[in-house]
Each structure stands twice: as structure tokens, then as C-alpha cells.
Amino acid sequence: MEGYTTLPSTATLKPSPFTVSISESKLQTLQDLIRLSPIGPADYNNSSPSTGSKYGIRRDWLINAKKQWEDNFSWRTFEKKLKKYPQYTVPVKGESGETIEIHFIALFSQRQDARPLAFYHGWPSSPFDFLPILDLLTNKYTPETLPYHIIVPSLPGFCFSGSPPIDLDYDMPQAAYLLNNLMIGLGLDGYIAQGGDLGSGISREQAAGCEACKGFHLNMILLPPPANMKELTLEEVEKKAMPNALAFRQSGMAYALEHGTRGGTIGLALQASPVALLCWIGEKMMAWSDSSSQPSLEQILETVSLYWLTDSITRGLYPYRRFASGNEPKINFIEKPLGYSFFPNTYLPCPVSWAKTTANLVQYRRHESGGHFAPWERPRELLEDVEEYVDVAFGKKDSPMMGPKAVEDVSGSGSHARGL
């Protein structure tokens, strides 16, 4: 896409243009494995009329999904979508001396006053989840009027980025530091971090520990219930969302514990079988999205194919070691401005009264629907929230008191220590 490819003059890194292109031999291997993969027998867990999806993937769904994947799915058609926006790779050095090749999508503005925004994906997601937001931005702005530099990287170990060194116990803070170096090296000091799921952890780490990050916006806040939880008020939509959080804590966290405690086993097992990976990821995409914005089967097959073809399921499980350690990380207050989009049907919805205890919350928007995958479930709403946050946090607009879907004035906090 012409016009969005001029890096700031202050850039010190020299990215190379990147084009998504999977070899025919790897695509043939994928097809062969799909075709040869047997589907297990029907049992109570996967086929009982009374259990629904309580115990995970339904066998009849898997039979149909496998058939569609084998007979009708076209990676090359999806690959064309992935090539729409400029992409690059560049070696970036991390805090432990490691150098990792980072892949990213970029829209570089021609405005001198453009504000840098970094969008970080989670699991099981990719930078391409943000394509609907990039579509909205390029429909709304031209390269000359775009008020932001947009950077959407593949996290280390995901998609087309390189892997952390095998002799390094890599963790989310290290990934955050390395991606901070990416932004600085692109001449984008003074950036805003945005994310959900793992991306929210990256964003928070950068806001807490990286001077170049001036603020952060989250569409998910991973936070254990505060000690004073009973003293904090909840909005009605938040009260309705709390059973989701309780159910997830009781029966939905097994995948994360497996990722964190037996990442070697589950990573190798899922990479060995695309159909097994379809079960593992497909279940989460359906369970974690809102009932009004369920992913199509085509979308699920696209995501699973991308993960399998790039070995992401094996390479990208490292952040979960921290979550499964048994030690709750200390959540210190961050003074930098935070914006927050509340989508009630994610698996761990965080009420705004809880969010206020973690950072200098200056902008908040409460939505009545939407789930874990906001960039493609609710791209317009998420982009509006981010743009509102930028204006509120950096002086272009006051934070008005409005209705349930609008921004609320939630700024303020006492004196707290910065950092994680």
C-alpha cells in the first residue's frame, strides 16, 4: 500500500520489506496430515446431547471442520489478505543480549506530529487480527492525514518473528523490552502500547518499565480480585459478567496450566497434528468470543493454519511459565495514563473499579457486548476507544461524563509507586 512506507528520519534500525509466502511443500505436508488424521470415537464428553460444549470440542463439529479444511480451504486466498499492508522484518537486540528477528505490519504516517501506537496481539491470535482496524484507519485517513504511526508486531516466537534463544528462560518482560527497542529503533520514541491477553501484559510491562512508552490502552486486564473487592462497586453489566470470570477460574484455566507447566509436551504434541491444533485453538476461539460475534469456520481454519505453518504453538508458549509459577506477580500502581475498554464476554472481565487500583485510569469505555478478540469482534468500537484515549490522555479532549457506552471521567488516584 503506497504512501505508508516512509520511516521517521530518526530511525536507527533498517527493516527489510517482508512478504508472506509459504512454500508449496509445507502446504502439501499440512494437507497430508489433515487427510491422514483420524478422529476419535464418540463418547459422553464429545457427543452427549446433554453436555453441549461443557467438555470442549464436539465431535460432529470436528468432523465437519476437518472436511472443510481438507476439501475447501485455500491458504493462498488467505495469504493474499495477509499481504494487504506493508510488512517488515528487522533484527532487534534484547536486554539479555539476545537478538531476535521481529516481523511487523506498519502504517507510517507522513505527518510530523504523528503519535506512535503499538498494537500487541495475544494467544491464540496474531498481528493479522488487527487487519480490520487497519482497514478502518486507511478508510478514514490518508498517509498525509493519519495522526498515528501504527506498528503491529508478531510477538517473539509467534508467526513470522524469530524465536527466543533455546538456552534462555524467556519471559514477557524480556519480550516487552525487546519490542520497546523495536519502537525506539524505528524512531518512534514516545509511543503508546495497546493490547489484550498477552498483549495487555506486554503493554503494562512497557508502561511500567520503559521510558519511551508514554501510556497504554488495554482491552483486557489480567488481575486477581483485589483484597478490598467487597468494598468496590460494580456496574450492572460488570455484575452480569462476573459469572464468566468465576467459571473460567474454576474450569477454564487448564490450558494455561498445561502451557505453563508442560509447554514442551503440549507444544510438540499440537505441532505434530494440525487436527489436534484445530481442537485446541478452535475451542478457545469459539468459547472466548461473544455469542453475537462468533468466528466463522473459515476464520478458525485461517488462524490454525497460520499457527501450524509458522510453528507458533511450539515457539509461543513461553509467557505461560510465569502465569503457572504459582506466584502471583506484584501489581504496583503505574502513574502513566491508562485507557480501558471493557468487553463483558471475555473470559476474565475486569471491572473498572478494579482497573483503577492498578494505574492512572484516565479514560474508560464500557461496552454491552464483545469478547476476548476485540480487534476482530469489535474493531470499530476498539479503534474509537483508542482514539478517544489518545485525545484524552494527551490533551486534545476532556473526558466527559456520558452514557453507558461512552467515555467516563475516571481519572485520579493517590500517591503510588510505579512499576510492576
Curated annotation (Swiss-Prot):
Pfam family, one: EHN
EC id: 3.-.-.-
Keyword Nucleotide-binding appears in the UniProt entry: no
Pathway: Mycotoxin biosynthesis
Annotated GO biological process: epoxide metabolic process
Gene3D superfamilies: alpha/beta hydrolase
Keyword terms of this UniProt record: Hydrolase
Lineage: superkingdom: Eukaryota
GO molecular function: epoxide hydrolase activity
SUPFAM superfamilies according to UniProt: alpha/beta-Hydrolases (SSF53474)
Family: Belongs to the peptidase S33 family.
PANTHER family: EPOXIDE HYDROLASE 1-RELATED (PTHR21661), HYDROLASE, PUTATIVE (AFU_ORTHOLOGUE AFUA_3G08960)-RELATED (PTHR21661:SF39)
Known function: Putative epoxide hydrolase; part of the fragmented gene cluster that mediates the biosynthesis of dothistromin (DOTH), a polyketide toxin very similar in structure to the aflatoxin precursor, versicolorin B. The first step of the pathway is the conversion of acetate to norsolorinic acid (NOR) and requires the fatty acid synthase subunits hexA and hexB, as well as the polyketide synthase pksA. PksA combines a hexanoyl starter unit and 7 malonyl-CoA extender units to synthesize the precursor NOR.
Protein name (record): Putative epoxide hydrolase
Organism of derivation: Dothistroma septosporum (strain NZE10 / CBS 128990)
